[in-house]
Amino acid sequence: MAENIVKKYPWLSITTTLEKYIEPDYYDKILKNYIFNGKHDLDFLKEAAESVADAANIVEFGPGTGRATSVVIAAIKDIKSLTLVELSDRMLEKCKERFSSKKFIEYINSDTIDFILSNNKQFDFAFSLWSFSHSVHQSLKSLGLEAGKIKVREAITKLLTNSLKPGGSFFLIHFDSLSQEQSISIKQRRKDNFVFQENTQQSPSKLLIDEILAKLKNNRDIDFGCQHFIGEPIKFNSMDEALEYYLNFHMESHFNESKNIQVILEELTNDIKKFQSLDGSIKITPGCFIYNIARKN
C-alpha cells in the first residue's frame, strides 16, 4: 500500500482476516446507532426476549462484543444455558471477559452455519442481530452458489424444525441491501465476492432465507412475520469518518491492503458525496428486515 495513502488515512493500517475481525474495542468505538421508528435495534430484541421470558435454553449467532447478549440476559431472568456462537476469536474473548460471572454461558468459536449443522442441542430462543447473513454469504462464496445454497437450506431448515424446540422462536435482524447505506458497501464488495453481482434485488442471503421460510410455512412447520424498516440517517461529521466506517466496519478492513485501494477510496468518496451537506456532514439512510419466527408445536 502506498505510504502516502496510509499517512492520509491512518485507519487503513488496520487489517484483519475473516476469523479475526477487527479489535472489539475499536468495533465498539466506531459502531453507529441504528434507529428504526424511534427505536434502537436493541429495543426490538428486548421486546422479543421479553415475549419469551420463560426461555431456559438460548443461542445467539454472532454476538460480537456482547451488546445484544446483555439485553437478553437482562430480559430473561432464569436462563439455564446461553450458547454464544462467534467466528471471531477476538470477539469471543471479549464476551468471556464481559460475562465472566455468568456461568451458564457456553462459548463456541465457529461459523454459524457450520455450528447449526453439527449441533445436537435444542433451544427455546435463538437470536442474531445483523451477522447471520455473513455466514450465509461465506458458505455461498466458499462452496459456490449451488452447493452453498444446499448447505444453507439444510442448516436453516434444521435450525427451525429441529434445533428450536416446538414453540421455540428465532429473532433475526437482516440488513436491507437496497438501502442507501448498504448499496454503497455492496458495490465495492462485488469486487471480491461473486455472490453480490445483482444490484437490483435483495442480497442472496435475504432471498434464500425468504425462500426457506416460505416453504416451511407452507409445510406448516413454522409461522413468521417480517417487517421492513427504513431507519434514521446515519450521521458522519466528515468524509474521513464515513470512509473509515465503510472500509473498516461494513467492509471489515478486507480491502485495506488491496492494490486497488486508491480506486476503491475514490469510488467510495464519489458515492458518499451524494449524501454530503455544504457543512461537510453526511447523512446516509440504513434499512433492515426484522423477522420473528416461531416453530409450531
Residue ranges of each PLM-predicted region?
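A short SAM/SAH-binding and catalytic strip from SAM-dependent methyltransferases
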Residues: D124-K151
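Local beta-strand N-terminus motif with an aromatic residue
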Residues: A55, Q122-F123
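C-terminal helical/coil "lid" or tail adjacent to the Rossmann-like core of SAM-dependent
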Residues: H228-L278
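Conserved class I S-adenosyl-L-methionine
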Residues: M1-A53
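Conserved catalytic/acceptor-binding region of the Class I
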Residues: K158-N162, G167-E232
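Class I SAM-dependent methyltransferase SAM/SAH-binding core
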Residues: V59-F115
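Core SAM-dependent methyltransferase catalytic element
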Residues: P286-N297
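A short glycine-rich, Lys/Arg-flanked "PGG" loop and its adjoining helix->strand segment in the class I
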Residues: G144-P166
